[in-house]
Structure formats: C-alpha cells, structure tokens
Regions:
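A residue-level signal for conserved active-site and pocket-lining positions in enzyme catalytic cores
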Residues: 31, 153, 256
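Active-site cavity-forming subdomains of large catalytic enzyme subunits
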Residues: 27, 208, 229, 251-253
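Structured, non-catalytic alpha/beta "coupling" segments that mediate domain-domain communication
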Residues: 127-136, 142, 240-269
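Gly-rich Lys/Arg/Thr-decorated short loops/hinges at beta-loop-alpha junctions or inter-strand turns
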Residues: 8-15, 171-175, 209
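N-terminal Rossmann-like or analogous alpha/beta NTP/dinucleotide-binding catalytic cores
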Residues: 1-68, 192, 221-239
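Short secondary-structure boundary/capping segments
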Residues: 1-3, 89-91, 139-140, 217-220
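NTP-handling and nucleic-acid-processing catalytic cores
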Residues: 37, 41-42, 48, 52-207, ...
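A short-motif feature that recognizes glycine-rich, charge-decorated loops
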Residues: 210-224
C-alpha cells in the first residue's frame, strides 16, 4: 500500500484486511520455505497465520476474558508513536539510531526574583516540546535550588505559570540540574508528572504537527517548531548557550521515522 501511495485509513478496515490477506497469499509460502530452509522442525500440516479465524477468535476470547477479570483497561499513557504510520509501536519493535544533536540551554524566568536570582537555566535536546512544559524539576538533594522549590516560572512564549518541584529522578550532575518537564511527550516526565500532579498537555497531533492554540507555531512540524522556538528564545535573549550532544533516538522499524513519545488512549494489560 505504501508503495502505491495508499493509506490504510483511506481505504477503510475491510479493504485493509483484504489487502493483508492478499499479501499473505503472495508471500506466505516464501516465508514458510525460508523457515524450512533454515532447518526449523515445525508441524507444517498445522500452519497458522496471525489472522487465521481460529487464531483471531482465540485472541478475542482471551481479551474479553481478561477485560471482565479486570486485567485490561483503557487509559491515556505515554506510548511510542509513529507519526508516519499513525500507530503505537512496542518497545521491542523500535530501532535505536545514534544522532549527533545538541543540548540547548534555555533561560526560564522566575515569576518573582528569589535572592537576586531572576531565572533558571534548563538543558534540553528537544526545545520544541517546551510548549507543553508544566513544571521544572530539581533534585531534592541539590542545595543550589532547594530555596526555589514551590516557586513558579513564567513559561516563555506560552506565558503560563509552572511550578518548580523536587523529584528524585533528577540527576543534578546532568545539564544544569534543572529539568523542563513535559509529561505528555517524555516517559520520564510523565512519571514525574504523575508523582507531582502535573498537567498533561499534548502539543503535537498524530502527525507530530503542533496543534492549534500556539500562534505562529501551530501547523509546524516537530523540526520546524524546534528551529522557530530556538530562534524565538534567541530573539528574547533567553537562549543561554548550545552544546553538541550525541544521543540515541527511537525510530519506527517499518518506516524509520523518528518516534514521538505521545500521550495516547490505548489498551493496557
């Protein structure tokens, strides 16, 4: 379908399932021959396909049984989201790619000066997510920031007040020891948000485009928003400095698009 430029969402569920069966007819025997060629000892007379009726029915039955037993629930949690395939990707399906990136050090102004301090500096590899920041975390053991816990920050560009809070997840040795917290777009931030009752704000839609409500940034892709937000911080005199930073990013095993940690409604076991 991808080679033909056809989206599964455009053709609908029934035609998509038909296409899956067509693919199976075209390639199923080749896959079985490859497995046999590797010397795998299988009962080839009792072959099952993921979408075989008896197999699919068994999965549905187990799902319903677990649901009625209270073992399955629907909730909004962080998932690995592919904005190209528009689907959640399991951890073991994600591929990691090393990337030469940057650490942007951004100045976040305090709502009111504290002991002569007018702002804190946060380090981030993803400045585009700051639109959804709902807090700044510091280590409870970090003497530099203990006096700031409970104070608030006026979030640049967006303008909302967000709290400074203490959480043991924070590594005071990384960056500045102040961590911008975006619960809807980072699994660790999500966990901190749960512990500290932070608001969850999705700033991207299912295609990783900035949603409405963010002025000129709305409608931008992740990369476009990153560039524009960094430029805005620089124009405001709030870009402290930038460092080179190599890190790994998760990509989709199907299309190799960078995955987006995204707050989504899914079924969980």
């Amino acid at each position: 379908l991808a080679e033909e430029g056809i989206s599964r969402l455009e053709i609908g569920r029934e035609k998509f399932i038909d296409a899956c069966w067509d693919w199976r007819e075209d390639y199923g025997n080749t896959i079985v021959k490859q497995i046999a060629g590797m010397g795998c000892s299988c009962d080839y007379d009792d072959e099952k396909f993921t979408m075989s009726p008896e197999y699919a029915n068994a999965v549905r039955k187990v799902f319903c049984d677990w649901y009625h037993d209270g073992l399955i629930y629907k909730g909004r949690r962080i998932v690995n989201w592919c904005p190209s395939c528009t689907t959640a990707i399991a951890d073991d399906e994600a591929e990691y790619v090393d990337e030469k990136g940057h650490l942007w050090y951004l100045r976040y102004p305090l709502s009111e000066p504290v002991d002569g301090m007018e702002y804190v500096v946060v380090a981030t590899t993803r400045p585009e997510t700051m639109l959804g920041d709902t807090g700044v975390a510091v280590s409870p053991k970090d003497e530099r920031y203990k006096h700031l816990v409970g104070k608030t920050i006026d979030l640049p560009i967006v303008g909302r007040k967000i709290p400074i809070f203490a959480d043991y997840y924070v590594d005071s040795e990384f960056g500045t020891g102040c961590v911008k917290t975006t619960p809807a777009h980072d699994p660790n931030d999500y966990a901190m948000g749960q512990r500290n009752n932070l608001e969850q704000i999705n700033v991207f839609d299912e295609h990783a485009v900035v949603v409405e409500g963010y002025g000129k940034f709305s409608g931008m892709t992740r990369d476009e928003a990153r560039e524009a937000i960094v430029a805005e911080f620089e124009a405001l005199g709030l870009l402290d400095h930038v460092e080179d930073h190599d890190h790994s990013v998760m990509t989709c095993y199907r299309c190799h698009t960078k995955l987006e940690p995204w707050l989504s409604e899914q079924w969980f076991v």
